Curated annotation (Swiss-Prot):
Molecular function in Gene Ontology: geranylgeranyl diphosphate synthase activity; metal ion binding
Chain sites annotated for binding Mg(2+) 2: D85, D89
Taxonomic lineage of the native organism: Archaea, Methanobacteriati, Methanobacteriota, Stenosarchaea group, Methanomicrobia
Pathway where it operates: Isoprenoid biosynthesis; geranylgeranyl diphosphate biosynthesis; geranylgeranyl diphosphate from farnesyl diphosphate and isopentenyl diphosphate: step 1/1
Protein name: Geranylgeranyl diphosphate synthase
Catalytic reaction equation(s): isopentenyl diphosphate + (2E,6E)-farnesyl diphosphate = (2E,6E,10E)-geranylgeranyl diphosphate + diphosphate
PROSITE patterns: POLYPRENYL_SYNTHASE_1, POLYPRENYL_SYNTHASE_2
Organism: Methanosarcina mazei (strain ATCC BAA-159 / DSM 3647 / Goe1 / Go1 / JCM 11833 / OCM 88) (Methanosarcina frisia)
InterPro entries, alphabetized: Isoprenoid_synthase_dom_sf, Polyprenyl_synt, Polyprenyl_synt_CS
Needed cofactors: Mg(2+)
Binding positions (isopentenyl diphosphate): K46, R49, H78, R95
Residues reported in the UniProt entry to bind Mg(2+) 1: D85, D89
SUPFAM superfamilies for the chain: Terpenoid synthases (SSF48576)
Length: 324
């Protein structure tokens, strides 16, 4: 029998997550609030974080059904951050569709995000497991949400700065993006019955691949076709976002005319991408992303050889080989 591809494996688990979302987050009164809350969740997304959680649990001997509420909780937290990020970043398009605040207004979007946030903890509390392990997971997720807020604050602060260093960027990315991957892996391990040592190693796996994921995301923003991205190519540059690519280029004395300009022609964008390629900044970030991914994969040495471990390794590789 032919082995399913990584995409098939993730889709298989995602279908269970989607069914659990329907059960645990039904559209009830007031309907518009729950429609707004479910809007991005139902729009799809990769479901990578729930997949990491489920695979971590399975890799240490548990099963999908026992951790489904936790997987849903992590996905709801992810979507809560997207809704609020789009408001703060003034991004009107998400996943190729109008953002939540465009359809329901900023106040409605804030409430939709808050609903997902609170429901995540309510749903996580429903996990049937040892109370001490559920409590540990609640602690992990609550601290993660705080760190995400810290990371978003740092990202916003960068917009007012003339200079941002690589270490500052890495702190921001770790808090804003990678901590939720770390939480997903750790929660899955804890609910699967893993020791604290194994759970911490899986947390490190999530943290490291999450950093690599964001670095590669920054690369894709400048290199992927717009129809794949679902947004304007080079939008980070035009918006004046301090990605590591830009930080590295500025440290080399490179000038980027479209940085913070707000808009640019296709020719201007292509010229900027050529400049970043020729100065080596794009390759620098690509290679650094690869090194984070490889280090993250090494953390899985604590696991026995099993299909789920292989899939976690493949997810790590996917972070730096995807098209969007």
């Amino acid at each position: 029998m032919m082995l399913m591809t990584l995409v098939d494996e993730i889709k298989n688990r995602s279908s269970h997550v989607d069914a659990a979302i329907d059960e645990l987050l039904p559209v009830t009164r007031p309907e518009e609030l729950y429609k707004a809350s479910r809007y991005l969740v139902d729009a799809g997304g990769k479901r990578l974080r729930p997949a990491v959680l489920i695979l971590a649990a399975e890799a240490v001997g548990s099963n999908l059904r026992s951790v489904l509420p936790a997987a849903v909780a992590v996905e709801l937290v992810h979507n809560f951050t997207l809704i609020h990020d789009d408001i703060m970043d003034r991004d009107d398009i998400r996943r190729g569709m109008p953002a939540v605040h465009v359809k329901w207004g900023e106040a409605g979007a804030i409430l939709a995000g808050d609903t997902l946030y609170s429901k995540a903890f309510e749903i996580l509390s429903k996990v049937e497991n040892e109370p001490v392990r559920v409590l540990k997971c609640m602690d992990v997720l609550s601290k993660t949400c705080t760190e995400i807020c810290e990371g978003q604050w740092l990202d916003m602060d960068f917009e007012t700065r003339k200079k941002v260093t690589e270490s500052e960027y890495l702190e921001m990315v770790e808090k804003k993006t990678s901590v939720l991957y770390a939480a997903a892996a750790k929660i899955g391990a804890l609910l699967g019955g893993a020791s604290d040592e194994v759970a911490e190693a899986l947390s490190e796996y999530g943290r490291l691949i999450g950093i690599g994921f964001q670095m590669y995301d920054d690369v894709l923003d400048m290199t992927a076709p717009e129809e794949v991205l679902g947004k304007v190519r080079g939008s980070d540059l035009m918006e004046g976002k301090y990605t590591l690519i830009v930080i590295n280029a500025f440290e080399k004395g490179v000038k980027l005319d479209i940085f913070g300009k707000g808009e640019a022609t296709l020719e201007e964008t292509e010229a900027a991408v050529r400049t970043l390629t020729e100065c080596g900044s794009l390759d620098y970030v690509k290679n650094l992303a690869i090194s984070y991914i490889e280090e993250g994969k090494e953390k899985l040495d604590v696991l026995r050889d099993c299909p789920e471990k292989t899939l976690l390794l493949q997810i790590a590789d996917y972070m730096i080989s995807r098209e969007y």
